[in-house]
A protein has these predicted regions:
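Terminal accessory carbohydrate-recognition/targeting modules of carbohydrate-active enzymes
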Residues: 1-327
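Glycine-centered secondary-structure boundary/capping sites
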Residues: 114-115, 425, 439
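Short capping loops/turns at secondary-structure boundaries
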Residues: 167-174, 406, 410, 432
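A very general structural signal that marks isolated residues within well-ordered alpha-helical segments
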Residues: 184, 277, 378, 390, ...
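Short, functionally important structural connectors and interaction interfaces within domains
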Residues: 251-253, 421, 434
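Substrate-binding groove/exosite segments of carbohydrate-active enzymes
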Residues: 301-424, 429
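Single conserved hydrophobic/aromatic residue that forms the stacking wall/gate
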Residues: 430-439
């Protein structure tokens, strides 16, 4: 492997056998969630983030969405007269930024040479988290077994630091993979097909309304050598199924990988996705994603969280199951709160979503940021510094009739600063004449 230091998992088989598999955060297809299909916060999604790109995988194994934030933070009209404009804020909602969101509902299907069509996942599939952070959808078919998973990688700690909170955030992109194992007892030949919707969203706040109604189509969809590039003035996505055959026009592509598997043989297929607000940023993201194989990136990301969480145990001897649930819940709370945070490449905070995902895209609500950041700091204390710099400039609205407006927001900087000092002992931040120099 092209990695320094110890490797946790040297093969995918080793990972599937040894990785921790949550028995409590798992789900099958939910008809209500699928039928309702309102804002993203209403849907049953398993989420993961590297601090830059947030993704959600659903129980049908689809990469339902992924998004990367815009760098521009702007004021929200909060507490004033409702003019009926496109967006407005409420008390404690002062600032937001746009986000480049691909609502692709990306999926895999298998077309066998005998004419049989098999979906990568179905309503009987189970989705859960492996090693607490990785969404995995597992499906058993009569002929084969599949595991579909997706993740946005954390950077290598040995890499040249690009941010003040290195190795967070990671690159603006993700991997969407499927492992196919032939259990038919004979040789299997066919094609693995990748398909997805070409839809972007960059601003949305309408709770209870159909999210898909607010999507926009790319201005241009075109092949760029091995990449399918989808471009809109507010978003750009570059998609590549590795080793694939690419046919058709950009707005109606046919993407597949021919394969042949012996009995009991398995193969992992990978789609690389870069997603950025601007076209000029795409190759930069791809340059990082191409550095390692998905298994190598998984090891890097897994090592980061294992190092940060350590080994967590509980002393609930009377009820072991309750102890295991409590352990899973504590880890899940921290990870979900981390998933709410979006950072620039330099490590500065852009927003704290009101959920991962939230019905209001990329909007920070003052009542949420304090518990979210305090929770995350127990594993990733560096984010506290980024949050403090954000709040020092934005813990008040651009304009209000009231001096405090939202007390939760107003004092959030003090609460986070106290917890940061307790967890890190970083006195330099409070004594330096130029605190930003301490980054």
């Amino acid at each position: 492997m092209h990695l320094r230091g110890n490797v946790i998992y040297n093969t995918w088989e080793n990972f599937w056998k040894k990785a921790y598999k949550s028995s409590y955060f798992r789900a099958q297809y939910d008809e209500t969630s699928e039928r309702t299909d309102w804002s993203l916060s209403e849907r049953q999604l398993f989420t993961q983030s590297n601090g830059r790109t947030l993704l959600g995988q659903d129980t049908m194994g689809r990469l339902h969405f992924l998004c990367t934030p815009h760098d521009k933070i702007y004021a929200v009209p909060s507490g004033g007269t409702d003019l009926g404009g496109q967006f407005k804020g409420y008390i404690g909602q002062y600032y937001q930024n746009d986000t480049a969101l691909l609502l692709g509902k990306m999926k895999y299907d298998l077309e066998l040479d005998n004419g049989l069509m098999i979906s990568g996942a179905n309503k009987q599939s189970w989705t859960t988290y492996y090693d607490d952070f990785l969404p995995v959808t597992a499906t058993e078919h009569p002929e084969l077994e599949t595991r579909i998973f997706s993740f946005a990688p954390i950077l290598e700690k040995e890499a040249v630091p690009a941010s003040s909170i290195h190795p967070v955030p990671g690159p603006a992109g993700a991997f969407y993979c499927i492992e196919v194992k032939n259990i038919s007892g004979c040789k299997m030949k066919g094609k693995l097909r990748l398909s997805f919707d070409q839809k972007f969203v960059n601003q949305f706040e309408h709770y209870g309304k159909y999210f898909d109604d607010y999507t926009v189509t790319p201005y241009k969809s075109e092949w760029d050598q091995k990449l399918l590039v989808l471009w809109h003035p507010e978003a750009c996505a570059a998609i590549q199924l590795l080793d694939s055959v690419c046919e058709g026009q950009g707005d109606n592509p046919r993407i597949y990988v021919p394969f042949e598997l012996k009995a009991n043989e398995s193969r992992t297929f990978t789609t690389v996705i870069a997603l950025t607000p601007k076209r000029e940023e795409i190759y930069s993201a791809l340059g990082t994603l191409y550095q390692h194989t998905p298994l190598e990136w998984l090891n890097v990301t897994d090592d980061f969280w294992k190092e940060r969480f350590g080994k967590i145990t509980t002393d609930i001897r009377e009820n072991q199951e309750a102890g295991e649930k409590y352990r899973d819940m504590q880890v899940r709370f921290i990870l979900d709160n981390f998933n709410c945070l979006s950072f620039r490449e330099d490590g500065s905070l852009l927003t704290n979503w009101q959920g991962a995902p939230s019905h209001s895209l990329s909007r920070l609500w003052g009542i949420d940021i304090t518990p979210d950041v305090v929770s995350v700091m127990y594993a990733v204390p560096e984010v506290g510094k980024s949050a403090m710099f954000y709040l020092a400039e934005r813990n008040r609205p651009r304009y209000s009739l009231y001096s405090d407006h939202s007390m939760f927001y107003y004092i959030s900087l003090l609460v986070i600063a106290g917890k940061y000092l307790e967890l890190t002992g970083d006195c330099l931040l409070y004594t330096s004449p130029s605190p930003r120099d301490t980054r």
